[in-house]
């Protein structure tokens, strides 16, 4: 499936003492459980409503952990839910890191206690969470026949790894449980298992594993209402949390399970976004009604997520159909449209939810913590990197030939993420079509160092694919070359599927490679040279500054930026094509021009007052572009007011239909009159409607006066790009990059409903617009 479906269920089991020794938040001797009839959670004998917000320490810079917890508490919440990502703690079999940087989840939990917040712990082993492989370690995929999320009888190797994981983290979890003076109210068993299977033996083995490690619960599970009812994927003595759970869903669950407590375990204030989608998802979600119902009924809930954070590095996940088709990779930002933005600021809905929750008796609203300052550098102050090193001049030794006869995925070589290079000399070459049966996930192809084109597993809009010669099929025509050219296929793994039955999603080339129409080379290719390229922090730290082939893509660009002071910022990569960025050695994550994300979050603690290094690896670009520093992920929504009529650029009748012609209308405060302006480094902008997520577009890319200006999904075309030309007093003309004509009102009319068209510039006031940020 392309998206994680809305599910419904989570189990919480009875009783445990609640206290935090040495913490200002709690005292010893507290008890937590639920009422005998399962209708309520109970703390110290009194009904207790869990008002939780989810955030993940792995996605938040450590210096900001306390700030984000305080933001959740100031919204009226009393609990933090968090995933523990197994693969982030154990990247190699048996080698655990529970203390370095964002991996120290126990320190995060202790901060929750210090801030007076309880905790719902969600340690998997599978978590989904739009995280690579749903948190399962990629080393599991080295076994060809691996079966994931099954009991020990079905795959003892999988379950043995789970046992090792639980035994490693249980000593950390145990003292933080309520019964032992910690803030953890409940521990979740697995995650949304009802959408994957119905193996009760597996769930019980997990429960017994925790019990055997001294963690006695309470436990809970998380599922969709339909799934938990159909597949009975709750656990003995546990409660049920419902994905997308409304007040009525909780009542329905308790009808199906009369003596089991239920809560809204994942209530979605936004949604996830994939590369290539027209706009950030979930921006218009309003949970006010659902929250009011839950508060009125004193039912427990968890906002997934109250703060999303960032998929730094290569940790973002993906979605795909069960057979692996329809693959879509998640963007780097995990802003999610959450009440607390990626950079920790209150989103527009934050204040509304805070006021709603705070209006109920017994809810206190602490003041918001101070926001982190931001810094910007634009125009001539924006850094412009210089070519620094070539990936091709920094190749490691090839892997042993015995292991590389046929192309194999990176997991077979113990590599978790990054890139793989597959190299083959082609004796007797006379032209051919390359057929790479299964690229996971994005390949650039070279013949004797000359770029031939690309192969992408994710769909790429034609406006981006055509100039780069990127195909989403498997076949790529190769050009002419000498009689023994070297074929290089560089493959980027973009994130493993994290939901559904297609979890076994290996990276690199996963099947055969062949040539057709090539005489003696016709057929399957073997005897490859293979290079493992994790391109991680250690790799970039050891780069040799050498570029022996300046015209060959795969260049690292470097800039040094001197800052008088630090602050949060976003690196605007809209002038670049596809790659990754490091700042002072920290991997900010992937960027890709197909969007919708164009800016990468750089937290202030990763910058220094003084000199800072920006390093960019771009898979296609040979000429560097400026990298402006911006204050936010996206521009603040704006309105466009026509100078002659005083009316606003408007999508009529709140239409979401592609092709709807725009008009002008009196201001109504609606999202159909609000636009997100994304401005590239060269001053060219696009305008995306906040309501529909579609862009201002010249119909059919026609250049005739009077051509309708419509809304249309993002396609990268120049007919969706506009130059802003100031005309004085804050007004500007919007000039089409494609046609050179301007955005105007048909007939220079001033009436509501007058159509928006392209026109030759006449200087009329109806061709001028005031762009005002909200």
Question: Which residue ranges define each predicted feature?
Answer:
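N-terminal export signals
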Residues: 5-25
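N-terminal carbohydrate-binding accessory modules
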Residues: 26-79
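Aromatic-lined substrate-binding rim segments of carbohydrate-active enzymes
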Residues: 67-74, 81-130
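Aromatic- and acidic-residue-enriched segments that line the glycan-binding/catalytic groove
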Residues: 94-100, 125-150, 317-329
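Active-site neighborhood of glycoside hydrolase catalytic domains
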Residues: 161-229
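Catalytic-core region of carbohydrate-active enzymes that cleave or remodel glycosidic bonds
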Residues: 245-331, 337
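Aromatic-lined ligand-binding clefts that engage carbohydrates, nucleic acids, or primary amines
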Residues: 432-449, 487, 561-584, 591-592, ...
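Lectin-like carbohydrate-binding module/patch detector with strong preference for beta-trefoil
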Residues: 635-774
């Amino acid at each position: 499936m392309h998206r994680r479906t809305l599910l419904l269920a989570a189990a919480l089991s009875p009783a445990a003492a609640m206290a935090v020794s040495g913490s200002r938040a709690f005292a010893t001797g507290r008890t937590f459980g639920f009422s005998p009839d399962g209708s309520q959670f109970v703390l110290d004998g009194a009904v207790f409503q869990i008002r939780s917000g989810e955030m993940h320490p792995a996605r938040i810079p450590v210096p900001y952990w306390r700030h984000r917890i305080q933001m959740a508490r100031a919204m009226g919440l009393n609990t933090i839910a968090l995933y523990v990502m197994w693969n982030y703690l154990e990247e190699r079999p048996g080698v655990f890191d529970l203390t370095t940087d964002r991996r120290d989840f126990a320190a995060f939990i202790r901060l929750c206690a210090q801030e007076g917040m309880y905790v719902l712990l969600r340690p998997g082993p599978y978590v989904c969470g739009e995280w690579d492989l749903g948190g399962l370690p990629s080393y599991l995929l080295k076994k060809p026949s691996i079966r994931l999320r099954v009991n020990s009888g079905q795959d003892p190797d999988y379950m043995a790894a789970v046992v090792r994981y639980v035994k490693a983290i249980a000593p950390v979890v145990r003292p933080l449980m309520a019964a032992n003076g910690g803030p953890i109210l409940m521990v979740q068993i697995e995650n949304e298992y009802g959408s994957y299977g119905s193996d009760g033996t597996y769930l019980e083995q997990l429960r017994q594993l925790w019990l055997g490690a001294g963690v006695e619960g309470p436990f809970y599970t998380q599922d969709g209402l339909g799934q938990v009812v159909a597949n009975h994927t709750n656990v003995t003595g546990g409660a049920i949390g419902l994905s997308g759970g409304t007040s009525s869903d909780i009542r329905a669950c308790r009808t199906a399970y009369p003596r089991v407590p239920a809560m809204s375990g994942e209530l979605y204030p936004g949604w996830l976004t994939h590369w290539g989608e027209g706009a950030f998802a979930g921006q218009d979600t309003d949970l006010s009604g659902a929250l009011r119902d839950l508060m009125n009924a004193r039912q427990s809930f968890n906002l997934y997520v109250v703060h999303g954070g960032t998929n730094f590095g290569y940790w973002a996940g993906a979605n795909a159909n069960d057979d692996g088709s329809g693959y879509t990779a998640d963007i780097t930002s995990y802003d999610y449209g959450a009440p607390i933005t990626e950079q920790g600021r209150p989103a527009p809905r934050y204040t509304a939810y805070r006021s709603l929750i705070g209006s109920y008796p017994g809810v206190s609203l602490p003041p918001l913590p101070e926001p982190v300052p931001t810094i910007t550098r634009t125009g001539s102050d924006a850094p412009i990197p210089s070519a620094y090193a070539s990936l091709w001049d920094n190749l490691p030794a090839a892997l042993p030939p015995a292991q590389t006869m046929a192309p194999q995925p990176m997991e077979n070589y113990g590599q978790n993420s990054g890139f793989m290079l597959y190299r083959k000399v082609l004796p007797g070459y006379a032209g051919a079509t390359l057929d790479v049966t299964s690229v996971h996930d994005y390949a650039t192809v070279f013949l004797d160092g000359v770029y031939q084109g690309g192969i992408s597993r994710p769909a790429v809009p034609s406006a981006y694919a055509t100039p780069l010669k990127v195909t989403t099929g498997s076949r790529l025509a190769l050009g002419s070359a000498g009689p023994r050219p070297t074929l290089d296929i560089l493959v980027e793994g973009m994130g493993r599927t994290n939901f559904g039955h297609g979890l076994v999603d290996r990276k690199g080339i996963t099947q055969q490679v062949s040539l057709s129409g090539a005489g003696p080379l016709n057929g399957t290719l073997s005897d490859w040279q293979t290079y493992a390229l994790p391109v991680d922090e250690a790799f970039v730290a050891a780069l040799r500054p050498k570029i022996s082939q300046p015209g060959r893509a795969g260049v690292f660009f470097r800039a040094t930026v001197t800052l008088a002071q630090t602050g949060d910022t976003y690196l605007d990569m809209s002038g670049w094509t596809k790659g990754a960025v490091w700042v002072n050695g920290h991997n900010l994550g992937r960027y890709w021009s197909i969007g919708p994300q164009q800016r990468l979050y750089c937290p202030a603690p990763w910058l220094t007052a003084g000199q800072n290094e920006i390093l960019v690896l771009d898979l296609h670009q040979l000429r560097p572009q400026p990298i402006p520093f911006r204050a936010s992920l996206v521009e603040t929504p704006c309105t466009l007011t026509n100078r002659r009529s005083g009316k606003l650029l408007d999508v009529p009748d709140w239409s979401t239909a592609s092709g709807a012609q725009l008009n002008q209308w009196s201001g109504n405060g609606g999202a159909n009159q609000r636009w997100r302006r994304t401005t590239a480094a060269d001053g060219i902008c696009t305008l995306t409607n906040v309501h529909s997520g579609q862009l201002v577009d010249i119909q059919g890319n026609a250049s005739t006066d009077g051509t309708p200006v419509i809304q249309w999904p993002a396609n990268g075309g120049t007919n969706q790009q506009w130059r802003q030309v100031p005309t004085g007093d804050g007004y500007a003309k919007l000039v089409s990059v494609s046609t050179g004509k301007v955005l105007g009102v048909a007939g220079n009319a001033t009436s509501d409903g007058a159509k928006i068209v392209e026109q030759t510039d006449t200087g009329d006031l109806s061709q001028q617009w005031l762009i005002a940020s909200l």
